[in-house]
Amino acid sequence: MERRTFLTSAAAPLVTGIAGQLSAQTPAASRGRLKQSVMASVWQGTKYSFEERCQILARIGFKGVDLPTAQQVPILMQNGLAPGMMTGTGTSFQNGLIRKELHDQIEEATHKGIDLCASVGCSVLIALPGERRGMSREEGADNAVAILNRVKGYAEQKGINVCMEITNSKVAADQRTDQIFDHTAWGIDVCKRVNSPRVKILYDIYHAQIADGDITRTLRENIDHICHIHVAGVPGRQEIDDKQELNFHFIAGVIADLGYTGFVAHEWRPAMGNDSVKSLERCFEILNV
């Protein structure tokens, strides 16, 4: 066989195979499958009032805002937006679910937080595992399981998801260097042990990429344990554009294809000199699959 003939015939199945792979990776469904919300960080450096922010978000196509106050919720609703996630478990990044000495007050606060969520139409209540301060991961997991077992019944009764957020312990600037939930596997293990449809994790893709990587496989294997998602560019926690290492448009397609129905919240900060509204418009379209 002549060299030219051989190369032509050999290339044909290769091209066909690559085309098939790309076709398989491209979502066939229409855009708009993900509900997008924002955290306050996206407005850094702006002077818009809360109502003006809501009007801008609604115009772009966003569906919610994370961590509004109870007083802000009516303004959200007047603009066709919803609270994506609420706070109110008595936990913090310093003192969280793993502190046994705080379990009584965490239980009381979480019941009130669940009631608040139910009253404003929000299905997600954030709960923070907290700092280790010398505690082993095993003891911390046992303590988290213990308090979550105490609140899961009420969460199930009210239909509210209590979710733990993963944070990385590597980047000093994030000020989360001693968090116990700094690898996805720790939180998934806790969820499996609690075994409740209302105890899940907030999968923060910025933190998870730094902590573990392997984002899409983790999503595919654990989507049933995820009730909320945060996004920001890696490194730097800025926009989710082509100036950082993750392909968020592809990741968004994976999330949508898995049938995920929760919010995907933008938690980036605009890069120096960038206009927040224009960045919101661009980043919204990146996740619009």
Give the location of each predicted region:
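Catalytic domains of carbohydrate-active enzymes, especially glycoside hydrolases
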Residues: E52-Q72
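Histidine-acidic metal/acid-base catalytic patches
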Residues: E2-A58, G121-S123, F181-Y203, H207-V289
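Active-site acidic/histidine proton-transfer and metal-coordination neighborhood
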Residues: A10-G17, S30-R31, N95-K200, I210
